[in-house]
């Protein structure tokens, strides 16, 4: 029975910069892919490709998750692939009915799953809400471990809606799970910003930061920003190691396990619409053991980033709008003679604390430069001022 179910997807309206390797990387996050065949139209039309999965359920989940998603600035069209033999049967409407039934399933995203939760567990948890066509926990292909989220597909829309409403926040395996529609909402009308946004190329973005930088800044989601939303948006591009969201500021940071995955995410998500907001994506700040970002700053025209999870964005005044309280700020004085960002003396002490790295000359720079009499290697709240 499984062998008779379709496993190959048509992926169209692709950018000419998209490669088979990128398509495989994106679609393999949903399920193991057997192969990908890119078709380049010599007549000048947009390229398209066919992606074949090992199992029908993975192909169905990829259809739900990837149709309408932007890849390198273009909204791709995903559908079941048809063969010449199936096209001949269209007159009997059998193929049309089969395809329509597959597309009429309603897919629910289930996030924040405990590592021990299996496909059978989520299927059993959602079974009381109606007839389920498919359920699965997404696993990492390399380790075989759960990625912490999954999908449940219902035959009936109302069953899916009821499951989303009733199961959101419920406990499953020691964690409160999150639920939402797996498919995206209809795209909002393009704003002036989105229409005028320059499309980034992968080669340009991947070279903007050092190979050790795996952090993406995503800003502009001024309402509805959650960790679940960011995980759902960025998980197709690679393994996510950490997500930090700041809903009151409208931005988040997503750290991947590889520089290449982060670059693909920046290229694909920048300028797209999330929850009705056009988002901006840049490289996050590199940590202290990475190369000095000042040289990168001069190459790409962005100011030096601030904070351990800072972002390449705007000027110093703009950065002040985005940095949350309790994180590193542009300038510090020494303990005993410290200034806030407005330059007012805040603290007096008879003896300044020299810190564990006293005597080590820090690098000089426009941001975080040492003030007069400031001890080397001084830290504030655990963050170095260099």
UniProtKB/Swiss-Prot annotation:
Where in the cell is the protein located? Nucleus; Cytoplasm; Cytoplasm, Stress granule
What residue spans carry the Polar residues bias annotation? 363-376
Region annotation (Disordered) ranges: 354-386
Residue stretches making up the RRM domain: 7-83, 106-184, 214-286
List the GO biological process terms. apoptotic process; mRNA processing; negative regulation of cytokine production; negative regulation of translation; positive regulation of epithelial cell apoptotic process; protein localization to cytoplasmic stress granule; regulation of alternative mRNA splicing, via spliceosome; regulation of mRNA splicing, via spliceosome
Give a brief account of the tissues where this protein occurs.
Expressed in heart, small intestine, kidney, liver, lung, skeletal muscle, testes, pancreas, and ovary (at protein level).
Name the UniProt key words of this record, in alphabetical order.
Answer: Acetylation, Amyotrophic lateral sclerosis, Apoptosis, Cytoplasm, Disease variant, mRNA processing, mRNA splicing, Neurodegeneration, Nucleus, Repeat, RNA-binding
**Description of post-translational modifications:** Phosphorylated by FASTK; phosphorylation occurs after FAS ligation in FAS-mediated apoptosis and before DNA fragmentation.
Result when mutating residue 384 to K = In WDM; results in a mild increase of stress granule numbers compared to controls; impaired stress granule disassembly
* Leader sequence segment: none
Entry-annotated residues carrying N-acetylmethionine: 1
Q: Name one GO molecular function term.
A: mRNA 3'-UTR AU-rich region binding
Whether Acetylation counts among this entry's keywords is yes
For this protein, the record's SMART domains field holds: RRM, RRM_1
PROSITE patterns to which the protein is assigned, alphabetical: RRM
What is the role of this chain? RNA-binding protein involved in the regulation of alternative pre-RNA splicing and mRNA translation by binding to uridine-rich (U-rich) RNA sequences. Binds to U-rich sequences immediately downstream from a 5' splice sites in a uridine-rich small nuclear ribonucleoprotein (U snRNP)-dependent fashion, thereby modulating alternative pre-RNA splicing. Preferably binds to the U-rich IAS1 sequence in a U1 snRNP-dependent manner; this binding is optimal if a 5' splice site is adjacent to IAS1.
Please give the subunit comment from the record. Homooligomer; homooligomerization is induced by Zn(2+). Interacts with FASTK; the interactions leads to its phosphorylation. Interacts (via RRM1 and the C-terminal glutamine-rich (Q) sequence) with SNRPC/U1-C (via N-terminus); thereby facilitating spliceosomal U1 snRNP recruitment to 5' splice sites.
Q: Which disease is it linked to?
A: Welander distal myopathy: An autosomal dominant disorder characterized by adult onset of distal muscle weakness predominantly affecting the distal long extensors of the hands, with slow progression to involve all small hand muscles and the lower legs. Skeletal muscle biopsy shows myopathic changes and prominent rimmed vacuoles. Rare homozygous patients showed earlier onset, faster progression, and proximal muscle involvement. Amyotrophic lateral sclerosis 26, with or without frontotemporal dementia: A form of amyotrophic lateral sclerosis, a neurodegenerative disorder affecting upper motor neurons in the brain and lower motor neurons in the brain stem and spinal cord, resulting in fatal paralysis. Sensory abnormalities are absent. The pathologic hallmarks of the disease include pallor of the corticospinal tract due to loss of motor neurons, presence of ubiquitin-positive inclusions within surviving motor neurons, and deposition of pathologic aggregates.
Protein name per its UniProtKB record = Cytotoxic granule associated RNA binding protein TIA1
């Amino acid at each position: 029975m499984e062998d008779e179910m379709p496993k190959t997807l048509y992926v169209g309206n692709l950018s000419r910069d998209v490669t088979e390797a990128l398509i495989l990387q994106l679609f393999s996050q949903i399920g193991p892919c057997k192969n990908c065949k890119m078709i380049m139209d010599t007549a000048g039309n947009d390229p398209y490709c066919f992606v074949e999965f090992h199992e029908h359920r993975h192909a169905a989940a990829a259809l739900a998750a990837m149709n309408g998603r932007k890849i390198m600035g273009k909204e791709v069209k995903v559908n079941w692939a048809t063969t010449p033999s199936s096209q001949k049967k269209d007159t009997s409407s059998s193929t049309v009915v089969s395809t329509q039934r597959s597309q009429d399933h309603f897919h629910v995203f289930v996030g924040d799953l405990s590592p021990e939760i299996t496909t059978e567990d989520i299927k059993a948890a959602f079974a009381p809400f109606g007839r389920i066509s498919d359920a699965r926990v997404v696993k990492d292909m390399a380790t075989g471990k759960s990625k912490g989220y999954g999908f449940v597909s219902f035959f009936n829309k109302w069953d899916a809606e009821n499951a989303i409403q009733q199961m959101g926040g419920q406990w499953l395996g020691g964690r409160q799970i999150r639920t939402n529609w797996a498919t995206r909402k209809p795209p909002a009308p393009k704003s002036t910003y989105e229409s005028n946004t320059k499309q980034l190329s992968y080669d340009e973005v991947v070279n903007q930061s050092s190979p050790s930088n795996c952090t993406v800044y995503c800003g502009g989601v001024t309402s509805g920003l959650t960790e679940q939303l960011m995980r759902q948006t960025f998980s197709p591009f690679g393994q996510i190691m950490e997500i930090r969201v700041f809903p009151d500021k409208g931005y988040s940071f997503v750290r991947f396990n590889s520089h290449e995955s982060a670059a693909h995410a920046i290229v694909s998500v920048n300028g797209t619409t999330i929850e009705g907001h056009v988002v901006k994506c840049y490289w996050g700040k590199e940590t202290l053991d990475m190369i000095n970002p000042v040289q990168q700053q001069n190459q790409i025209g962005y100011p030096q980033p601030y904070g351990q999870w800072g972002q390449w964005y705007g000027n110093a005044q703009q950065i002040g709008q985005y940095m949350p309280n309790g994180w590193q700020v542009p300038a510090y004085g020494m303990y005993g003679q410290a200034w806030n960002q407005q330059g007012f003396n805040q603290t007096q002490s008879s003896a300044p604390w020299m810190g564990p790295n006293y005597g080590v000359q820090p690098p000089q720079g426009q941001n975080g430069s040492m003030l007069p009499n400031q001890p080397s290697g001084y830290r504030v709240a655990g963050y170095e001022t260099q």
